[in-house]
Design a protein with these regions (language model features):
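Glycine-rich cofactor phosphate-binding loops and adjacent beta1-alpha1 units
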Residues: 176-179, 209, 219-306, 372, ...
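Glycine-rich beta-strand-centered segment in the early N-terminal region that forms part
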Residues: 38-62, 73-120
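Residue-level marker of beta-strand positions
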Residues: 90-92, 110, 138, 183, ...
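NAD(P)H dinucleotide-binding glycine-rich loop of Rossmann-like/cofactor-binding domains
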Residues: 78-80, 89, 114-188
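N-terminal Rossmann-fold cofactor-binding loop
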Residues: 211-215, 252, 313
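Mid-domain Rossmann-like dinucleotide-binding core that forms the NAD(H)/NADP(H) cofactor-binding site
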Residues: 156-236
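C-terminal hydrophobic helical "lid"/dimerization subdomain
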Residues: 9, 315-387
Length: 387
């Protein structure tokens, strides 16, 4: 099948690789290519494969974390002698073959990753993401790091679901809001993870207040029925009327929003964050020089208000199961911005990582998908894409 990869500069004329264009990222030029990758050999009876599954990826998506990982891996390609580099961590795949000890899946099943963390899903396995190389098209993954895609979910929806939904469910569970109730606020609310958080909170009956750095369009508001929205521009403070108004704050980027969150939270409130915006020095988009001062002010406010500050990485298998169950009940989510074909790889990468107007996940189709799949690509100019 056709695989999408970033190609090493000295391999651009290599036979068998079709160069699709390039993307400039952090002063580095990433060349994107397509190549035929044959089905790997897989003997399910060998000890190395008994607990594993061979997958053919039907669609995949990138997460925010993948941008820094791709850059790190690219900068090491020459040292490691790599000709090309796949990328992407969310996927919907078809089971092609299973190991002799695998009883949970069979050929033809559709699966997505289970990114359970911090507890490993089986002895000897590392917790966390199932792959960082979904664009390769063929994956060999331990069965314990997979879960079945429900029949109600399209391939495109499944490819955009697991990591964000599992993280959001983990953050909500660990915040304690389901037990205590409360008035939640979501920072950077148009980010992919925040959209999952908002949808899940709405599903539980909450009316989250969603803050983003620019105005909301009517189309975007329709994706979050029952939520209230507002604007919190970078470098500004929340409106005085919102100070000490909320019981729980959910934030994907603590390096942007921690101080604002401490102002928004009431005494005894809870702040939960799952990461930071600037994850790679070459891709750090103007982190304020005064960020250390802002952090000090934020922690001082947390002390005065007796706030609980929690970090959260991914979620447990039960969190993903909870999110999948909610989807099957409501058919709500995930928010998908655009769907791309392999020849649109440059536009896909730009939209996934560098388009401030993106709303939801971008999905790349690698193989045939369900007739009911979401296919609503936006037509837009991507000025930073160069072919």
């Amino acid at each position: 099948m056709k695989s999408l990869v970033v190609v090493a500069p000295d391999q651009l004329h290599r036979k068998g690789i079709d160069i699709l264009g390039h993307v400039d990222a952090g002063g580095t030029r990433l060349h994107l290519g397509q190549l035929d990758f044959p089905q790997p050999d897989f003997d399910g009876k060998t000890p190395a494969n008994r607990e594993h599954v061979l997958l053919r990826v039907r669609a995949f998506a990138c997460n925010f974390r993948d941008k820094g990982i791709l850059m790190d891996n690219y900068l090491q390609m020459d040292r490691l002698g790599k000709a090309y580099l796949p990328f992407g961590s969310d996927f919907c795949a078809e089971v092609v073959a299973v190991g002799s000890n695998v009883t949970t899946f069979r050929a033809g099943d559709r699966v997505m990753g289970d990114f359970a963390y911090p507890n490993a899903p089986a002895p000897g396995l590392l917790p966390g993401v199932a792959t960082n190389f979904a664009s390769l098209g063929w994956l060999r993954i331990h069965a314990a790091k997979l879960t079945t895609v429900p029949p109600e979910m399209s391939d495109h929806q499944a490819a955009a679901f697991a990591l964000g939904a599992q993280t959001a469910a983990g953050m909500i569970r660990r915040s304690g809001i389901l037990e205590s109730g409360g008035n939640p606020v979501i920072l950077s609310a148009r980010s992919a993870t925040s959209l999952f958080i908002a949808q899940q909170l709405i599903g539980y009956g909450f009316r989250p207040h969603c803050l983003s750095s620019s105005e909301w369009s009517s189309e975007q508001l329709q994706a979050l029925p029952g939520a209230t929205t507002g604007v919190l521009r970078p470098g500004t403070f929340p409106a005085q009327a919102d100070h000490s108004k909320f019981t729980h704050a959910f934030d994907p980027f603590f390096d942007m929003n921690l101080e604002a969150a401490t102002l928004l939270l009431a005494n005894g409130g809870t702040y939960v964050t799952c990461g930071l915006r600037d994850q790679h020095p070459l891709l750090s988009d103007g982190t304020p020089e005064e960020s250390g001062v802002a952090l000090r002010r934020a922690l001082a406010m947390a002390v005065v208000k007796n706030l609980s500050v929690k970090g959260n990485c991914l979620g447990e298998s039960s969190d993903l199961a909870e999110a999948l169950g909610a989807f099957c009940d409501t058919r709500v989510g995930p928010v998908i911005d655009s769907v791309f074909e392999p020849q649109e790889a440059v536009a896909f990468l730009v939209s996934s990582f560098f388009d401030p107007g993106r709303f939801g996940k971008c999905v790349m189709t690698l193989a045939s998908v369900n007739p009911g799949a979401v296919t609503t690509p936006r037509t837009k100019a991507l000025a930073t894409a160069t072919v």
